[in-house]
Amino acid sequence: TLFARNAERLEAAVKQLSGEGHAIAVADFTLPEDVTQAVASVVAHGPVDILINNTGGPPGGPAHAADTEAYLAAFTQHLMCNQRLVQAVLPGMRAAGGGRIVNVISTSVKQPLDGLGVSNTVRGAVANWAKTLANELGPDGITVNNVLPGATRTARLDQIAETKAAKTGQTPTEVLHAMAQAVPLRRLGEAEEVGGAIAFLCSPAAAYISGINLPVDGGRTRSL
């Protein structure tokens, strides 16, 4: 089941998927009650074995300049809605004797990114929430892990490049090139590569992996 706020985009995404049985659920993650109602309709049709949390990032800017409302909005969209989704799918996972929860966050949980103050803050909170869940849910056979994408070719990265270009006088293409050169592999990541890491953590091969932060960043993060 694909879960997002835009029904047309969800339907278009389903058409690109192979196989049958794909469904959509529509909810606005700025409205937690929307999320609760939508996920209830999903679990009513059967248990959820795998939950992937992947919410778009908040607007950029320095941490000290952000309004408190921006922090509250980010925590609502990320942590609060993630919590509601977990609470909704947990009974089915426990009844099945296990499950997988994967949160797509950011390498900023290991190394804060300049100009993304609110995002850095909320991503760190989600990472600690997930680690806590891994400890709590392990006895139920449920693994909880985080995937940390680096500079990956997405609309979000284009947005960040355009914002930085407007401030520095560079072109967005020049900004993206500089980002790629800062990666040891000297290129940007692809969404499919992040998807591969998620698929691995949801596979039987990762049954004994829980509570980790897995960077998918071409080696850019400097910490161990």
Predicted feature locations:
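Substrate-binding pocket helix/loop in short-chain dehydrogenase/reductase
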Residues: 62-75, 101, 179
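Short, small/polar-rich loop/turn modules that mediate ligand/substrate recognition or access, typified
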Residues: 138, 143, 209-211
